[in-house]
Amino acid sequence: MHSINKIKDTSTPKRRRLGTGRIFRLSLSKTAQKSDLLTDCSPISSKSVDIGADATERCDSPLLPCNQVEFRSICDSDNNNSSFDVPCSPDVLQSSVKSEWESLNVCTSKINEICEINNEITNNQAQTEVLEDISEDMFQSKLEQSDINHVDKSFKDKIEQSFDIVNQSISNLDEVMKNKSSMFETRDSFLLDIKEDAIEKFVHPNQVVQESKKKETAVVNANNTFYGLPLIAKGLFKTYRNIEKFYEWQEECLNLESVRERRNLIYALPTSGGKTLVAEVLMLREVLNRKKNALFILPFVAIVQEKIWALSTFAVQLEFLVEEYAAGKGHIPPKKRRRKNSIYIATIEKGLALVRSLIELDRLHEIGLIVVDELHLIGEKGRGGTLETLLSTVIFTNQDIQIVGMSATIGNLHEIAQFLRADVFQRQFRPVELTEYVKLGTMLHRVVWGAHAQGVELVPHRELKYDYSAAATALDPDLLGGLVSEVVPKGSCLVFCSTKRNCENVASLLCKLQRREMISHKKAERQALESALRAEGANAELVQAVRYGIAYHHAGLASDERSLLEQAYRSGAISVLCCTSTLAAGVNLPAQRVIIRAPLVGRDFITLGAYRQMVGRAGRAGVCETGESIVICGSREWPQLQAVLRGGIAAARSVLRPGAGALLLSAVALKLATTRPKLRTLLDCTLLAVTGDDTPSDIKSICDDSLRSLLQSGVLEVVNKRQSGDDASHLSEKDCYIYNDSELTVSSLGKAAIKGCMDLSVAKQLLLDLERASRSLVLMGSLHLLYLVTPHDAAGVRPDYSHYYSLYCSLDEEGVQTAKILGITEHNAIRMMTGKPIKNVPEIVLCRFYLALMLQDLWNQMPFPAVAYKYSLARGTVQSVMSSSASLASCAARFCAELPRLWSFCALLTELAGRLQHCAAPELQHLMELPNVKKARAMQLLRAGYKRVEDLAKASADELTSGVSHLSRNAANQLISAARMTLIEKVENLRAEAEDVMEELNV
């Protein structure tokens, strides 16, 4: 028998055993004739078995069941270092040698004998009580708490080691695949892999623990070796970013006292100055050194996905998580992780939802840093109010969270800094020199800043002369084709146009003016791009332009088309991109030359901020050696453009006033502020209190007006209503008064609106729609549910009423029933076709039903071009409606979860949101979950044999580049890292669930 580690005696004390035994024998004087039998069976018998004095001395516990004897044998395994054991009596030690059946028979016979005795004494209540006392005294013997804790810790460590093994296996798949590991053979889940212990075939748990400790030590020792990051980060920046040393301003910024002391900071530099790199280093420090999570706020979904793509390689190697919060993606609230930290990359709206969910669960302290890109958007209508709400809420909570903002175009930088209570760091640095020009007539003038008393001066540079024919001159009087041909095809050029239609016209014009060398450049890549665009159903004009290395890029294109064009532009297959101003603030596409076709954005004259964003795309480090910008300006437009250039960047003013009620409502719902004075204090933390002309009395008035509106709408309530007093304000027509100490609470509708991150108007309309649907929901298909999540403003789409009747006539039974429920009949369709007004059905219902029919066709996987043609809409509009509906479905699911009477809709809408996100074939769904992987790329991967994310995770860059056409090695590496990051996140989600269970069990 293996040696048994001696532990402290935990059985009943000997003196106490003798006392209870004497009482027991006296109480059974009437059954003395059976005392011998009882003594043999008594669990407190002093009878011993000679199996070692050590065991006999320490253990005299009752017999254990056979299964516990088996557990003892497991504990006494080959591992002699075990520090825990189960104390057993000599009887148990002896019986453990017997077979299980023999042990069971002995136990059964003795139990039967005891039962005979007990039957004789059941009439004596006093004797029964004595027996109960003795039984309780005997069987409540417990192990030492330290031994129990050790068992719990061992169990917990074993589970955590299993997850660590899986994570390291994914991170080191390159080495694992070399050893022909079967970690990612075709299986359905990681749980199966863990359960079957396939991971133990190539990694031993002890080795993992030792390697983990070595890595942790290395991280600590390597701090401050590469700008405060582990030394491995230096190699990652070199490999994936081609960065070996930071710019001087970046080093200066990272070593600021405000950064060291974790004070809030705003840093402002021109576009392309390297601002994002500083933010990334700060976030890496936060998750690696301080072990806190970081939140990165970005303005657009495309930029979120681009940043997820870029940081995945760092996350896999440095062992942290990158989580996407955009559109329908992201867990609300986020998974609570105890082993790894996360960088949450989110849009403004999703960032607010994330912060609110953490506050509600008292987990906001898990975030240590919030970084806001394009901070100037705080002054933009709509989204600016959401961003201000987010930042004001964080400031008011006072949770020691550092806020870092960055922007190139803030006119009132110090006012924004006052609002954020932040230090300011400002430099005028560009790694690539930018030369700015203005074209007046045929003369190109260079813009000289600061040379004139008024701040800007034009200096004649050269006269433009090209070998244009008379026909070409008539076609292109502004000489745009000549300006483009000076840099392409060897260089790249962005042409900013005022409208989407203008983008298409300019691209068509340039195709007619390009030379032969432009046509022959990268011909094979362009032919492949043509094929891909045709497969997406792109316009013939766009496909034709691609042959010349020219394309247009605007919101009217589907996201798959835009993604293909962006990749082609980066690879050089597309040399000229005609785009709208939204590209300047969106996807990162630098150029050697930027041309602004006219000083207009839509119908409005260009602002200095928009101008800075556009020209900032010219000349990016590592991409172009020089940068040039040219504004084509007419003689009549020059005075106004000159005033814009001299006027300075517009200030970012608060746009919170219309949304102040939503801020106050969320504060009450989250119990941040539930009285009127505290709510005023919250408003004092906003940009509204800094940049507006509002005085403290105005802030008080805004607070009271907002409270009055919330009370009247029924989403806010006073806990204990009282009559008028000196410190009360009259806030409603029903003699409802609110005192300074009156507690406020939020109604169920208000809580649901906060959970769903909805405006009250949207929440009320959604509730009305759901209540109507609950009485007559059509579940023959998806149409009625799709109607419920169509944008409530119909996304600005007005249907073609002449086409409405033909759509109505083609409806199946599901469509007719849904239309009937909504009040739409054939008579209505006929009136629409004939142009007669409809009075019995609101126009917005007709518009939303039109969009619901469109979404149903997408749901049934009708191609985007066919849907766009059928409903007379641009493909970009179709995709925008689908994305908006998916987001609303996700919000509506959380809204319904807060209202018990709508529980059934919660399940339906949750499933709807997931499927509506892509509306792709089932085999493409998982691949399209990866960042920046659209349908076209997913189809390429599927044809190359990569059917699952796991297939991509175990692939090599060489295999991907050879199997997928026109995929660069760098893009292949990032795609592999993104796949591995996705799998690691799944494993960490399972770990979080396991840890939650163990926490519930107090393990």
What are these regions (language model features)?
Residues 576, 583-599, 628-631:
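A short beta-strand element within the Helicase C-terminal
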Residues 625-704, 722, 925:
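C-terminal or mid-to-C-terminal helical accessory/interaction module adjacent to the motor/catalytic core
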Residues 244-397, 401-409, 413, 417-420, ...:
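Conserved P-loop/Walker A NTP-binding site and adjacent catalytic elements of P-loop NTPases
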Residues 406, 411-418, 423-504, 551:
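Conserved interdomain linker/interface between the two RecA-like ATPase lobes of SF2 helicase motors
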Residues 2-256, 261-266, 518-537, 542-543, ...:
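Helicase-associated low-complexity/disordered flanking segments
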Residues 295-296, 305-308, 313-326, 496-576, ...:
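Conserved C-terminal RecA-like helicase domain
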Residues 666, 695, 699, 703-713, ...:
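C-terminal helical accessory/scaffold domains
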Residues 600-602, 607-643:
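Conserved segment of the helicase C-terminal RecA-like domain
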